[in-house]
Amino acid sequence: MLELRGKKVSDGIKEYVSKELETLSFVPKLAIVRVGENPDDMSYERGATKKLKSFGLDVASYVFPQDISDEAFKKAFKDINEDDEVTGILLLRPLPRTINEKYIENMIDPKKDLDGISPINIAKVFAGDTSGFSPCTAEAVIEVLKAYDIELTGKRVTVVGRSMVVGKPVSMLLLKENATVTMTHTRTVDLKKTCSDAEIVVAAAGRAKMLNSDYCGQDAVMIDVGINVDENGKLCGDVDYATLDGKASAATPVPGGVGTVTTAVLAKHLIQAAKMR
């Protein structure tokens, strides 16, 4: 079984970023906006900061207390959004319930919205319009498949998960690549058959080791987007990776797979935002 490691893909994106940086007259700056001290958010923030800085890009974190009022956060976010020195924004979600997240999604400048959360960018993804930004994780899936020369045209692809972060947008991106896409979720009847009939499975349900080799057709490709913690406190995906050998032709590990590419896509989007200016 071929291990689809994200480092190779990330290195390819880094090359693109380095070349494009040379053509710019300034260093693009990413604003990471975080509310509260959620360990997952903080971990992602550290990883993204480290990756983008290693790519030669500028990163600034804007951290607000968990109990910030809706009004105060709207004002602070407006200032970041309108700051000419900020090239792109990554808003770590979900926000506390006291903050109107929909309002913020509508407020963010689509040209700075690097993770594709604004209604305009979401509409572009669903329309097959590549002039906007798609969610980084969804795009990372496509980057992995392309980097390893995995053909998508005409292929049967099953996507497990229907979130606006991964499931729905990745389905649209796969359709744009001429794949034949089946969208499923945890309530799909006979999920096992739908997955095992596919040539490529994208697992994005958010349930630890939910899919084992029974969900994998012979020589299928398994792309695991899940980031979970197993019963031993170890990081794992939605796919039970250890069961795949002898069944899958290729699979992404967790950690070291799609997640590694997600932050590289964020860097690529920052460069693209800089070029739009």
Residue ranges of predicted features:
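Positively charged, low-complexity intrinsically disordered leader regions
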Residues: 1-26
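Short beta-strand segments enriched in small/hydrophobic residues
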Residues: 27-37
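Glycine-rich phosphate/diphosphate-binding loop of Rossmann-like nucleotide-binding domains
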Residues: 35-49, 132-221, 230, 234-245
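Short beta-strand elements in bilobed, periplasmic/extracellular small-molecule ligand-binding domains
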Residues: 52-66, 181-183
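Short, well-structured alpha-helical segments in soluble
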Residues: 72-84
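Anion-binding alpha/beta catalytic cores of soluble intermediary-metabolism enzymes, centered on
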Residues: 88-152
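Short, well-ordered coil/turn residues at beta-beta hairpins
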Residues: 92, 204-205, 224-225
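Rossmann-fold NAD(P)-binding glycine/threonine-rich loop
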Residues: 102-123, 223-277
